[in-house]
Amino acid sequence: MPDQDTKVRFFRVFCWCPVLRMVRIMLMHAVRAWRSADDFPCTEHMAYKIAQVAADPVDVDPEVADMVCNRIIDNAAVSAASMVRRPVTVARHQALAHPVRHGAKVFGVEGSYSADWAAWANGVAARELDFHDTFLAADYSHPADNIPPLVAVAQQLGVCGAELIRGLVTAYEIHIDLTRGICLHEHKIDHVAHLGPAVAAGIGTMLRLDQETIYHAIGQALHLTTSTRQSRKGAISSWKAFAPAHAGKVGIEAVDRAMRGEGSPAPIWEGEDGVIAWLLAGPEHTYRVPLPAPGEPKRAILDSYTKQHSAEYQSQAPIDLACRLRERIGDLDQIASIVLHTSHHTHVVIGTGSGDPQKFDPDASRETLDHSLPYIFAVALQDGCWHHERSYAPERARRSDTVALWHKISTVEDPEWTRRYHCADPAKKAFGARAEVTLHSGEVIVDELAVADAHPLGTRPFERKQYVEKFTELADGVVEPVEQQRFLAVVESLADLESGAVGGLNVLVDPRVLDKAPVIPPGIFR
């Protein structure tokens, strides 16, 4: 018989508001491959259990609803800053080729467009600068990637604000819980494989679909969003921004087919030819995935964290550390070497443990540089700050003094940092590093930082004020001040928005800004 569930407790600890500490009852689900001949009923499938969570009509806690609004503001901030970048312009042009009478909104422009294509364009805009929220555990995730597809569907179907919030809370919960339990990168599978099912589950909650429909939508979404991590390896291309947008678009289409009565490959995770057996750890391995027990509130969004700096999340604390260290070092020309002791994930994904020579190439793409901790640490050390455009400018990367310092920096895995990275207690998790700076004199300067300043446990944690400041700063010169304030007012009242009013979440960009976007050659969609 299938493995039984075991109840476990997770503690939520938030430094900015101790009263929010609480205990949630979670069910820990054993997930492994089964042979087709085995007795493995549908009700035991992981997709079915996720569908149960999605269909559970629990209330949304006020602080959770507030955080949803924060992340909508955060996405809008990053989208505004990315409006004239080439990948965003390409995705927008594709979406504008799909107008419909009663559709969704494309960020920055007027009109009504097919929800799947609007989600595509808005997903690329939100992801392009690698500047919105993150959750790190067994795998990596950017759960705000769920926002564009759910908002697009809500706009096309006239869903009210409260239902949109419910859907996003589910999407965050499922995305984060899968990230806690199933490691994808170990098997070179891209982390959008957790996003597709989360989008399907979130839409299911938002539309109050039945459990069976959600189950099939989840199965289809996972089946179609498993891809390799080559998108984040070596010379990283603009597809890194398109990948989550594609998963969101696929998730919408999966729900649409399931609503029309179509089924899905099953059991998608556990099948003899399924994801675990052939794409992940194989038939001998058992994963353990936590999900809220029936009736339990969905609060996982509160365990995620946004970015103050436009770079891979595991570089957030090192950037703050570099800014702090520069005053102690003084003359940077006196540096002989810098070794960053950090977690396994950080070492192999953005550090020298990746073995990617492209991470030291002054002519590398922006996407490659934002996954190069040696480059990021060097620039932050020299400038004492980080900027989403100036820090990546080609002339900045090619500066001779930067290249020289950059090549003095390496990373090593430290078992203690790896342990803290995977710690189940949010109050003890750490995503930082210890820097050992050796000067030509032989002096060694050592400092470390566990979490970024903007992290909930950091020195300057992000709250609504900081989210709004990030939006107004990045939207400056892109979105008129009156439009900025209109958008923020709509977000503030999201829970009270009636059917049809969610379209107000779109932000219109000054047409003169869009005129600066690169000229894109025509494609198939016109």
From Swiss-Prot:
GO cellular component, one term: peptidoglycan-based cell wall
Top EC class for this record: lyase
Pathway(s): Organic acid metabolism; propanoate degradation; Carbohydrate metabolism; tricarboxylic acid cycle; isocitrate from oxaloacetate: step 1/2
The organism of origin for this protein: Mycobacterium tuberculosis (strain ATCC 25618 / H37Rv)
Upregulation: Activated by PrpR.
Catalysed reactions, semicolon-separated: (2S,3S)-2-methylcitrate = 2-methyl-cis-aconitate + H2O; citrate = D-threo-isocitrate
Documented EC number(s): 4.2.1.79, 4.2.1.3
Domain of life, source organism: Bacteria
Descriptive protein name: 2-methylcitrate dehydratase
One MF term in the entry's GO annotations: aconitate hydratase activity
Keywords, comma-separated and alphabetical: Cholesterol metabolism, Lipid metabolism, Lyase, Steroid metabolism, Sterol metabolism, Tricarboxylic acid cycle
Disruption phenotype: Cells lacking both prpC and prpD genes are unable to grow on propionate or cholesterol as the sole carbon source.
Function according to Swiss-Prot or TrEMBL: Involved in the catabolism of short chain fatty acids (SCFA) via the tricarboxylic acid (TCA)(acetyl degradation route) and via the 2-methylcitrate cycle I (propionate degradation route). Catalyzes the dehydration of 2-methylcitrate (2-MC) to yield the cis isomer of 2-methyl-aconitate. Could also catalyze the dehydration of citrate and the hydration of cis-aconitate.
Pfam families, alphabetized: MmgE_PrpD_C, MmgE_PrpD_N
InterPro entries per the UniProt record, alphabetical: 2-Methylcitrate_Dehydratase, MmgE/PrpD_sf, MmgE/PrpD_sf_1, MmgE/PrpD_sf_2, MmgE_PrpD, MmgE_PrpD_C, MmgE_PrpD_N
UniProt-listed GO biological process terms: cholesterol metabolic process; propionate catabolic process, 2-methylcitrate cycle; response to acidic pH; tricarboxylic acid cycle
Signal peptide boundaries: none
Assembly and interaction partners: Monomer.
Listed NCBIfam families: PrpD_hiGCgrampos
Family note: Belongs to the PrpD family.
Other facts noted in the record for this chain: The vitamin B12 restores growth of the prpDC mutant on propionate as the sole carbon source. It suggests the capacity of the MCM-dependent methylmalonyl pathway to support the metabolism of propionate independently of the methylcitrate cycle.
